[in-house]
């Protein structure tokens, strides 16, 4: 079925209604019929992103809507007094749990304005059901399904595999609960890492259960039954266990809602995001393409404004990268520091929001960004908003702001350091590679790949990493005074809900 079928259905319904009104002239003394309820349609056609992709034009496509775009659409619906209800249609738009939580707050805002909200999708997984728990009604496409098994996480430990390949992960961690290196150095999790991850999953699971129990009016027994029977449910089973409200074929959705609003007709309106100007680019002109590729983004406001700076991806030294065709994007310390300097000195910028969605990365890059953030904070307010994650270096940056706001399901913390090298001497032997190293200077050989560290060398590395850890911890103490590092540092992870406590 075409993705714009519902829009055509809306247009056809409006035309039919107009034709009927023109065909019959009402008597002069008759009372005009009440206007039909207005229903706003908001379609989320792909997974929202944190920030626009500057390379989208290269593939002939518009921008994916950002999460902020979608929240803006929902807020527009909430503010429009002519709207009686909102239909949110998810079209091949899998969400993260945190995205569902942020969009859910915007849905709650719509409902608080006195409007009903209906969620429609061809199928539902756990995050989409969590989003639906904020709505008045969850509608499933007839013949569709829902999957609600709970939470599951699987880790792979590669120490034996690396040994078989002749590779030794020579890694050092500072922080008993850090554990980011254990996949390479162990065959099973350490007790500390196991405790860390289990506590995180317990928190996420508790948040999930609380939201579903509240939104779907289920008690503990009912929720357990929904997971037992609804782990892979057809529409009938999903409705029986209470994780959806109705199963409706898309062409019948308007009639279904007419019943819900006690109306014989509905006035449909579309609320759509700006898809960007990718279509305006002349792809037949190589000069136009290269000019667009290397064009600097405009960041200079012409009126008083609050600036938003995205830390989205791994934190790296130097310039930010978009990731190209195969790589992952990286947030560069040089790029972000330059942006922060411009915001610091721009009198029209009255405050700065740092939006973080990052697992961390380079400690040096994180420190450089932290320093730039503190310089801004000395002159104007700085707040941090956390998306899915602000862990390790991401949290390092966050503590440079005055306040940190996170979702209940956001992941924060991981105050610790991991580093080292991969020693490939055994692999070289298997492949009959002969490596010859030539060093100048007493410590130059420390980073060679052909030999592991001695205990003395490893101790030297550990001392330098401990210095990095101590600096990280001092930044946390300065930014979060009163925080007990004995119970929060050492690499521990927290949900947003637990981090507030």
Please annotate each region the language model reported:
Residues 11-21:
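Bacterial N-terminal signal peptides
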Residues 220-241, 246, 482-501:
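Amphipathic alpha-helical substructures
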